[in-house]
A protein has these predicted regions:
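Extended alpha-helical scaffolding regions
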Residues: 421, 915, 919-934, 938, ...
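Carbohydrate-binding surface patches
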Residues: 770-830, 877
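Catalytic domains of carbohydrate-active enzymes, especially glycoside hydrolases
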Residues: 352-377, 381-386, 540-549
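Solvent-exposed beta-strand/loop surfaces of large extracellular or lumenal domains
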Residues: 836-861
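Aromatic-lined substrate-binding rim segments of carbohydrate-active enzymes
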Residues: 375-426
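Charged, amphipathic alpha-helical linkers/stalks
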Residues: 883-930
Length: 949
């Protein structure tokens, strides 16, 4: 830590400063406190000679005054590495940095106090008496400046030297005061050996001197900011002890306290240093707790974020887009499975049998997402094979280039499959991975400046001595050694240019939620040439695939580019080592003025317009991605997680929130029961009633249904992105397939009824007696009930997502935003289905095959009453409106019961009467024939009432 009124030369590995200027403030005004910005970027604190020898600290870490100097986070990491090596347990570098920051802040507060109380630091030297000189002499021996440490001069000589016109006694007294304050701080306990005051207590009148210092400042005016009244100000000693009193066990919390209490006096530049120091603590916590995978609950989606302007610019759908049903297939695994099914080698895309395309068409599938089509990283494959996966291919998301893989048949094979799929009404879909690319990709070799990198390793404990993974003689590629031992997950890899000698450490792709993707290289989106290169690649993909899925798209929204890679001070911590490379909001806006995805959407719409853009996006950004950024579709992970966990009230709230905000967002959700990163649908939902109930919701709610690889067949293995073939020996669940044929595929072929939102309505299910619909009841949040229409077609879906029994009424819809009026509106079930007030409605339950008849008057006044068992589902379709008194008889006779045919029931009730009437008419005819009168021909089915659709 720099001592006031002392010159020092600071030399570190990456920082060379000569510091002599002492900040002097003419007042405590906020405006003028900015002069603190001229302070050095370096922080210092005391380290005893004993600790220096124990840990073998580097000479360049110390200033001439003997204090350890932390010029940047890298210096703190080197210091912590030395301690870690000796102790055998990790010393967080962020703690070392925090020690230096707190020490620096205490010095600044002393300087500020001097401005309020001029000459106080000169008076205190006289007040503590002659004993203080002996104490300061001992202090200088225990915590020696460089010249004393190297025996170039003794401690007394050093103290007699003058800096800025006064001896070093005064500045050393200030250092000793801060040393004492530091020793009273419980949070520094793990590091107390660095600056332990015990040697001073044992061999000098140190305790007496410290007591004299305390008494002196009690008698002086208190200290405070300009807003603090004189009577409310505390002594300087109390002010300096306050952080440890407020947060005795946390250095980070102490920094937060100092920031909140004294930030106005520290100046903007130093405030940012504190914020970055707090971020540094967060980064160390992240780095020490890499776990991977999804953790925690999925939050209920809301639409209240205002980080960036959220205007409405939906991309209009082409006519085919709302009816799309997407099937995901891991390309290599699927080809291997087809080879076994058809008993012949099926290795290329053009060898996929037409019979398989027939099957997809029969099942109502209109989109085929082929995962892993692109040429993959050779380094990624080598890494996996070196770790024991001998038959692995590279990850499907660590790419070499956007060319169809040669072993899949290349572009010719794709063209063949694309044409044949189109004959079956199926469009092909491919991934685009914009966030990162393979560590040995063409871009890493040819355009290293396109990637986020450092000229040095961000952590001193990283080593890069393993195999060269490069397939190009021009460069060397090495990942960090601890990967091979599974003891660390480095945030960078090493790229060595054999032609120029350039060495840089490129960041791995990372979304901040788990471990870095260590076979990938992170692109630098602050550079316009990178953004343009990615847009050109997207256009290339769009010209070959009408459906593009963007991997981890949320990481490239502006707010997350900054949060992850260029964090504002105080907002870092997501990715270790990035806080020190952050930007202010203004700096970031200058670098990336526009949302990248908005540019992509507009360019694709102009150049390849018949392309559906699908974003894998989470983090509460679903609405923003489709409504403002213009993506056609966006992942809705809440569907899978909440329905699996039976967080039914939460998912109903997701739907309600979406309807109240903008129903068009609901239409653009991608709903799924598994995705390649999650367990299979059979593992998560089983293969019985709950599975079919949730799947029914998936294919009848607005949005894009996405069916997983092997889901229909009941396969349970989760296929890794590096799999060439399935590893489990599984058989198709024929009963499950038949269940789909009976319950699901008839619905997929009627997707047009369910796809849109203009007539979609969600209902509350009130648990009430069947004869008491008007009484107040309780909403059963476990029941999902909704209706939709497409012209004259009507549909009502009801599903009970719980193993329990319930009964109640469906009557009024939840509120939905009417964009024409700008108001929230509700409708009754009868209004939503456009039913007449009189007449009768006949409809079929596609789950049971039974038909029902209800009075339209009852549907209008009461709604519909249902009794539901555990995981029971109804899909009421084929609504017909009939009139006539005879249908009243049919309705009353059935009393809500379902029958195979309502018309059959009608015939059963009235066939005898019809026959009697026919016999009577024949008698009249015969009688008239005998009398010679002209006979009118009877009308066919004249007793049947009129039916309307």
């Amino acid at each position: 830590m720099r001592v006031a009124r002392r010159s020092s030369i600071v030399i570190t590995g990456y920082c060379v400063n000569i510091r002599t200027e002492i900040p002097v403030f003419s007042s405590l005004s906020i405006q003028e406190s900015s002069s603190i910005d001229r302070r050095s970027n370096c922080f210092e604190f005391h380290v005893s000679s004993q600790a220096r020898e124990k840990y073998h600290f580097d000479e360049q870490l110390f200033a001439l005054n003997g204090n350890v100097v932390l010029a940047d986070f890298a210096a703190a990491r080197r210091f912590a590495k030395k301690m870690t090596k000796v102790r055998g347990q990790v010393v967080p570098a962020s703690d070392i940095n925090a020690l230096g920051l707190i020490d620096e802040i205490l010095h600044i507060l002393i300087r500020q106090y001097e401005m309020q109380n001029p000459g106080v630091m000169q008076r205190v030297l006289g007040a503590v008496g002659l004993d203080a000189r002996a104490v300061l002499l001992k202090f200088t021996e225990v915590f020696p400046p460089m010249a004393v440490y190297h025996r170039e001069m003794d401690a007394r000589h050093y103290l007699d030297l003058e800096t800025a016109g006064q001896t070093n006694y005064a500045s050393t007294l200030e250092e000793m005061l801060i040393l004492h304050i530091t020793n009273q701080n419980p949070a520094v306990g793990p590091y107390k050996e660095l600056f332990d005051e015990e040697p001073l207590l044992r061999s000098s009148p140190y305790e007496h001197t410290v007591r004299a210092l305390t008494d002196f400042f009690k008698g002086e005016p208190g200290f405070g900011d300009p807003e603090t009244k004189a009577e409310d100000r505390e002594s300087l000693i109390e002010v300096m002890l306050a952080p440890a009193r407020i947060a005795p066990l946390s250095l980070s919390a102490q920094l937060e306290y100092l920031l909140n209490r004294w930030g106005v006096l520290l100046g903007e530049s130093f405030v940012q240093k504190i914020l970055r120091g707090i971020d540094f603590v967060k980064e160390d916590a992240v780095r020490g707790n890499f776990t991977g995978g999804f953790a925690g609950n999925v939050p209920v989606l809301t639409f209240t974020s205002h980080d960036y302007s959220e205007y409405e610019r939906f991309s209009p759908d082409k006519d085919w887009m709302p009816q799309l049903i997407l099937m995901a297939k891991n390309s290599y695994v699927w080809l291997d499975q087809l080879s076994k099914k058809y008993q012949r080698a099926i290795l290329r895309l053009d060898q996929i049998p037409d019979e398989e395309l027939d099957v997809l068409q029969q099942r109502g599938i209109t989109g085929l997402w082929l995962i892993g089509l692109w040429e993959r990283s050779i380094a990624s494959q080598r890494m996996k094979q070196m770790m024991g996966q001998a038959d692995a291919v590279a990850s499907a998301y660590s790419l070499m280039d956007y060319q169809i893989a040669a072993d899949l048949g290349g572009w010719d094979a794709l063209q063949n499959l694309r044409w044949r799929a189109w004959q079956h009404g199926i469009r092909l879909s491919a991934d685009m991975v914009p966030n990162h690319i393979g560590i040995d990709s063409r871009w890493v070799v040819d355009n290293p400046d396109w990637f986020l990198s450092l000229p040095y390793s961000p952590y001193p404990n990283y080593s890069f001595n393993g195999a060269d993974l490069s397939n190009d003689d021009r460069v060397g590629i090495q990942i960090e050694d601890h990967y091979y031992y599974k003891t660390d997950a480095a945030v960078v890899f090493k790229r060595s240019d054999r032609w120029t000698g350039d060495t840089r450490f490129i960041y791995h792709g990372n979304d901040g939620t788990s471990m870095p993707w260590n076979d990938t290289a992170q692109l630098d989106y602050s550079k316009p040439e990178v953004r343009e290169a990615i847009i050109q690649t997207i256009l290339h993909v769009a010209r070959n695939f009408p459906i593009i899925r963007f991997d981890a798209a949320m990481t490239l929204a502006k707010k997350h580019i900054q949060r992850l890679w260029f964090p504002e001070p105080g907002h870092g911590g997501a990715i270790p080592s990035r806080s020190e490379h952050g930007m202010t909001r203004d700096q970031f806006e200058a670098a990336i003025p526009n949302e990248f995805w908005r540019e992509v959407v507009d360019r694709v719409a102009a150049e390849v317009p018949d392309t559906l853009l699908l974003a894998e996006a989470f983090w509460m950004m679903e609405g923003y991605f489709v409504r403002t950024l213009g993506m056609h579709r966006v992942y809705n992970s809440a569907f899978m997680h909440m329905l699996r966990d039976e967080d039914n009230a939460k998912y109903r709230q997701v739907i309600k929130n979406t309807l109240e905000f903008d129903p068009q967002v609901l239409k653009r959700y991608v709903n799924f029961m598994n995705n390649p990163d999650e367990k299979t649908a059979a593992e998560q939902f089983g293969t019985t009633e709950k599975y079919f109930g949730v799947l029914t919701l998936m294919v009848t709610l607005p949005g894009l249904p996405m069916i997983g690889h092997g889901q229909i067949e009941g396969l349970r293995e989760k296929y890794g992105m590096e799999y060439r073939h399935a590893k489990w020996d599984e058989s198709v669940d024929d009963n499950l397939v038949r269940g789909h044929e009976w319950r699901i595929f008839p619905l997929t072929h009627r997707r047009s009824l369910f796809a849109n939102v203009e007539d979609f309505r969600l209902y509350d299910f009130y648990t009430q007696d069947p004869q008491n619909a008007g009484a107040s009841g309780t909403v059963n949040e476990d029941v999902f009930a909704f209706s939709n229409r497409n012209g004259d077609e009507r549909g009502l879906v009801v599903y009970h997502n719980k193993y329990a029994e319930t009964r109640g009424w469906i009557m009024n819809s939840a509120a939905a935003m009417d964009k024409a009026s700008g108001k929230l509106i509700q409708k009754t079930l009868s209004e939503a289905l456009s039913l007449p007030k009189e007449a009768y409605a006949i409809f079929m339950d596609y789950v049971t095959g039974l038909e029902y008849i209800r009075s339209c008057q009852e549907l209008t006044e009461k709604g519909i009453f249902l009794e539901l068992g555990g995981y029971q589902c109804h899909v009421f379709l084929d609504w017909r409106i009939v009139n006539g008194e005879q249908w009243q008889v049919v309705c009353e006779s059935l009393n809500g019961t379902g029958v195979p045919s309502v018309y059959g029931k009608f015939d059963g009730l009235f066939a005898a009467k019809v026959e009697e009437k026919i016999v009577a008419e024949k008698r009249v005819i015969n009688k008239k024939a005998k009398s010679g009168k002209k006979i009118a021909k009877p009308r066919k089915n004249q007793s049947k009432p009129k039916t309307t659709l």
